[in-house]
Amino acid sequence: EPVPTDFREPWLFRVNGSLVVIGFEGHPVPGNAADEQAKNCPDWPDAQEMASTHLAYLALAVVAEEATLVENARTAMKILGSLTRQPNVSAINSAGRLFEPERFRSDVLTMQHSETAFPIFNIVFFGLWQREEDSPLSGYTLGLDRFACPDLEILESPDAPAVIRAQMIAAAMVQITRGAALKDGEVLTLSGTIFKAELKASSAVPGAVTTHLTAIEK
């Protein structure tokens, strides 16, 4: 479809088996969501400033029609990457956090030279937290709902932070590549540890239901 002459009208087009909708919203992201997501950006010192000063945003929806979930996600990231070249773009809001535009675009460009490259950190957030200062680390994801899958949690793991993240990344890719959520009670091996998947109320995200991965054997 041609680009609308009235910026208030959404732009709809199809590409790579997906329906794409881009809309302009002439106001800040509602509910201070950008400010909250800026807190998840320890690697970008300017995130809070970008969140607090933005005046409008572009909303993007990419719906798989004939594309697989992976193909659809790759298309979404490529379109977001192209939007970073628009004038006055200050941040990309994805995966429960904000990205510096050039960094997001740089990650997306890795897909130009590989049909299998999938910069998962641009579309799924992998976080770590503790109940108390001396408690074991727990891990969680945000963003798997776009793949019609519950987000993941690993609670109070004895493993190192890098291992916990690797386990969650592996579990996320299992769901994304097969296009289906882990089944309640399913057993799988991640980074040499056998886990059981169980659907429960989230400990990290109030009100959410997530897939908890519980280690049953090393």
Range-by-range predicted roles:
Residues 1-34, 49-53, 179-205:
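Long, low-complexity, Ser/Thr/Gly/Pro-rich intrinsically disordered segments that act as flexible linkers
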Residues 1, 79-87, 168-177:
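Hydrophobic, Leu/Ile/Phe/Ala-enriched alpha-helical segments that form helix-helix packing faces
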